[in-house]
């Protein structure tokens, strides 16, 4: 059977790096196995699911290059879920409950005060037909719980190894809400069974949920997939990530921070693994290096500063053709390959705007003009200029003035760029050009 893995985000907020890490790991796993990657929107929360968030999920995955083989919405498959729910009701595995949210909160508080886990007491199973009729006559509508078997649930996790849960330590989950809407715990099982999902790779916050869903798979006669539970990412301080607050959202990293997609992918693919984090220019490279067995159970931290450093390393490796579009959006004239080669190490493509100004915009006139610069101006070679011009010219200036080292180069840099530091002048000088260089050496605004 061909490997098939789902990424099932909820369109209730912006994707953050933790969500996208799961998407990337699923995608890498599928591609390494020659299988299929499915995107399935968990839009069962109708109140909080928004079209703009669904569109954002597609935009983020496309930006990263995580192509999918199938795209689905759980809300489109309620018909299939209704059939399964009816069968579970008929078999007695789904039973109606009538407690209000307030009553359930009181039960949980009572259990907590006794130091006991919040496990549902199955009071609804003790209701007779007359009791249910009376409650419904009062206007109460049932929600439906799945009756768990009080037997051990075990599986071999691809990340955590052998996992064991006692069924008696789990609470019967609500699978159908009071308004008749099927919830994620049921819809995801039905979809996984219908779509022949072979592996489910998700966060470790789903461990108890997996134990529950294994029993649901068995109850509906579906093949139980292989599970893998990854440790959840935290920020650099160890705090959890929240997509609803926009914390470290992919959209923000792309649109506000200027992060390259392969910088983010290179980092997220290796966080929490035994591999060194190195810049990669293609997803194919990450696929070749991927092995889920390398994922550690330790909690990985996402450091934006580490991402920015990796972004700079990625930019240093990218050819002009890969950045031409971004460069054109950052500067006010069409850039050239020579300009891209000339700019110093950038953390973001947008920083090229600053260096475009150095080579093409006026540098402010200085109040005093050292005689040395006037002499240097007279020694400027004729054009055309190339990468050897800087060395030829400064050699002539050194021979004429006797200056060397910092006394030679720093005044020239300040006059030509208005800065003390920056890219190699052998690259920048041909972009500045002879006319502009002569004026700047003469102290003119040029």
Swiss-Prot record:
Protein's organism: Azospirillum brasilense
Homology family: Belongs to the class-I aminoacyl-tRNA synthetase family. Glutamate--tRNA ligase type 1 subfamily.
Motif 'KMSKS' region boundaries: 240-244
Function of the protein: Catalyzes the attachment of glutamate to tRNA(Glu) in a two-step reaction: glutamate is first activated by ATP to form Glu-AMP and then transferred to the acceptor end of tRNA(Glu).
GO biological process: glutamyl-tRNA aminoacylation
Name of this chain's protein: Glutamate--tRNA ligase
UniProt entry tagged with the keyword Ligase: yes
Motif 'HIGH' region location, chain numbering: 9-19
InterPro entries membership: aa-tRNA-synth_I_cd-bd, aa-tRNA-synth_I_codon-bd_sub2, aa-tRNA-synth_I_CS, aa_tRNA-synth_I_cd-bd_sf, Glu-tRNA-ligase_bac/mito, Glu/Gln-tRNA-synth, Glu/Gln-tRNA-synth_Ib_cat-dom, GluQ/Sye
The protein's enzyme class: ligase
Self-association state and partner proteins as the record states: Monomer.
